[in-house]
Amino acid sequence: MSEYRSYTEQMTVLDGDSDFRRCLKPSALFRYVEQVSADHARAYGMDHAFFRERHSAFLVGKQALRVWRMPGRAEKINLTTACEVFKKGTMKRLTTITSETGEKLALVDCRWMIVDTEAGRILRTPGWTMPDFQNDDLPEELPQIVHKSQPLTAAGERRASYSMCDLNGHINNSLYLDIACDALLQEVVEAAPLSFASIKYHREVPMGQTVQVFYAPSGNGWYVLGRREEHAAFECYLEFGSSVTESLQK
């Protein structure tokens, strides 16, 4: 993304963020992307005080992940992030993860919204601009469709415990991938690494509350649904394997 306005950080895959394959967990990859996105904003003066003064906040509405090779434990990776101007109430942010040698490892396509924290409503565009922060257009994108399926199998209930919640007091967006993977049969996640995920965030799950989790096979992957108070809290579509399926290439 060198031809676009972007921001790059180098990170190291921590042991505590690695799974049984000694590779970075997908949820941890989302956390790393979340961090570099926040650092990008702060580098342009958009810190907590900036948003507090403007009574606004960024929220993630949906995001998708494509993995070519998940980085391994202790591997150094580069995260390059770039965002578009707001279009139809959302801001696209692309984050490309590469190795030290330039190998493209993964891509995250995240769609952000801006919220008026006083009025409690989503805005079409923010009431402010930051010079040189955004791009007019980022042509690359990932499929954001969550392939639903029936019948659903119950996978239990998860409580929004202290360790799952972030500085906003609800389950961190990245951890819904853990919840989704935990819902599936163990042989599914053992058979092959995650190659694609798309997730939609419908309702926050505040600390102390619970979410009921369900799953179903869907085409070449799996559909996972989380419900809170009889309403969808999140929906996720997951594929496991070394290559993306034909359905995702359309």
Q: What do the PLM-derived regions correspond to, one by one?
A:
Residues 3-8, 64-148, 205-207, 216-250:
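HotDog/MaoC-like acyl-thioester-processing domains
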Residues 2-60, 107-109, 115-196:
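Hot-dog-fold acyl-thioester-processing enzymes
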Residues 159-241:
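Acidic/His-leaning functional-site neighborhoods
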